[in-house]
UniProtKB/Swiss-Prot annotation:
The gene is rsmB. One of its GO terms (molecular function) is rRNA (cytosine-C5-)-methyltransferase activity. GO terms for biological process: regulation of DNA-templated transcription; rRNA base methylation. CDD domains: AdoMet_MTases, Methyltransferase_Sun. This is Ribosomal RNA small subunit methyltransferase B. It comes from Escherichia coli (strain K12). The lineage of its organism: Bacteria, Pseudomonadati, Pseudomonadota, Gammaproteobacteria, Enterobacterales. Coiled coil: none annotated.
Length: 429
């Protein structure tokens, strides 16, 4: 039996690592969840994701409730108070329980002398909640986004930025990809129904199913046997444009964690697939995905800017370049992105994408297809990136996705309930 731990203090420390140290919640949370009982895993996740989703509101409230911010070794208490405020605002946890557990968290982080302070701040919020929220809702902080990102969204989408922000602040739906080599989508939906769950097929993407209510993967029919994979609908859209065929040599570049690698092999089981990623640690997840689905691909560690180092002079019939990006289209799924990214990252990422595109293009056969994809909503990484590439690359032609003046297809978060995603299909003349 696992030792009873204070979830509020664990959540506070996790959020602090994201905000103060720039660590990804995807790396921090799984080891923490291993330390708590199964029934507490979901609450720990909710507290971490919820605080990061609403961080600017919680910060704003603390600044109103406290004369001075907590600094230095007491900084964790700042995040513990955030966890307390989040529970009072957004969960159905009874207020007395939320207060008691949060105050006890001070002991877990070795700050028992601050229990009274935490209790006082949270009770003060309860007393002033109505007035504070009215003031907050009249401020720019209500958008729950850093100002640099808000400015970029307003500039890129003058008519739509508010709906993008609203979608980013929602909890994401759970999308699945049905492995067509095992089941048709309809037959798997029947199995899901038998398991007491409900799913809805996507109108455009033939393998995509949205769960009515998110569920643990082990509850999904045939998950361990590779019948189904968790993957957002928009990410599945890559296959619509790539259209892989049996017998072809296909490169999945920037492939980790392998969701698109395995989707290629589901659509074209006899394709020769090479999956490449720069991050050796994340490549282990590509192997895991291939193993669970019973598939084979050539997996290599390599830098997309220097393809000759890992594929020599080899050319491919099709290339999927899921480029490194700001991930501003998947904020609802990874709210820590709002606080990990900086404005200066965008031109740096655009430069990296440009270098990878130029380096990999010679490795596409004449007549071949390259699909450039990102999970970003920012034009610098998407339409402007492809426009510049077309202008400097004489043998590249845009196909089916937009126009040379406005190249690519941009999904916005919430549209069709998928994440924000960009695709451009290029043919080599």
């Amino acid at each position: 039996m696992k030792k009873q731990r204070n979830l509020r203090s664990m959540a506070a420390q996790a959020v602090e690592q994201v905000v103060e140290q720039g660590q990804s919640l995807s790396n921090i949370l799984p080891p923490l969840q291993q330390k708590v009982s199964d029934k507490d895993k979901a609450l720990l996740q909710e507290l971490c994701f919820g605080v990061l989703r609403t961080l600017s509101q919680l910060d704003w409230l603390i600044n109103k409730l406290m004369a001075r911010p907590m600094t230095g070794k007491q900084r964790t208490v700042h995040y513990l108070i955030m966890v307390g405020l989040y529970q009072l605002l957004y969960t159905r946890i009874p207020p007395h329980a939320a207060l008691a557990e949060t105050v006890e968290g001070a002991i877990a982080i070795k700050r028992p002398q601050l229990k009274g302070l935490i209790n006082g701040v949270l009770r003060q919020f309860q007393r002033q909640q109505e007035e504070l929220l009215a003031e907050f809702n009249a401020s720019d902080a209500r958008y729950l986004h850093p100002s640099w990102l808000l400015k970029r969204l307003q500039k890129a989408y003058p008519e739509q930025w508010q709906s993008i922000v609203e979608a980013n602040n929602q909890r994401p739906p759970m999308w699945l990809r049905i492995n067509r080599t095992h089941h048709s989508r309809d037959s798997w939906l029947a199995l899901l129904d038998e398991a007491g769950m409900k799913g809805f097929p996507h109108a455009d993407y033939p393998d995509a199913v949205r769960l009515e209510t998110p569920a643990p993967v082990h509850a999904l029919p045939g998950f361990e046997d590779g019948w189904v994979t968790v993957q957002d609908a928009s990410a599945q859209g890559c296959m619509t444009w790539l259209a892989p065929q049996n017998g072809e040599h296909i490169l999945d570049l920037c492939a980790a964690p392998g969701g698109k690698t395995t989707h290629i092999l589901e659509v074209a089981p006899e394709a020769q697939v090479v999956a490449v990623d720069i991050d050796e640690q994340r490549l282990s997840r590509v192997y895991d995905n291939l193993k669970r689905l019973g598939m084979k691909a050539t997996v290599k560690q390599g830098d997309g800017r220097y393809p000759s180092q890992w594929c020599g002079e080899q050319q491919f019939d099709r290339i999927l370049l899921d480029a490194p990006c700001s991930a501003t289209g998947v904020i609802r799924r990874h709210p820590d992105i709002k606080w990990l990214r900086r404005d200066r990252d965008i031109p740096e990422l655009a430069q990296l994408q440009s270098e990878i595109l130029d380096a990999i293009w010679p490795h596409l056969k004449t007549g071949g297809t390259l699909v450039y994809a990102t999970c970003s909503v920012l034009p610098e990484e998407n339409s402007l990136q492809i426009k510049a590439f077309l202008q400097r690359t004489a043998d590249a032609e845009l196909c089916e996705t937009g126009t040379p003046e406005q190249p690519g297809k941009q999904n916005l978060p919430g549209a069709e309930e998928g994440d924000g995603f960009f695709y451009a299909k290029l043919i080599k003349k």
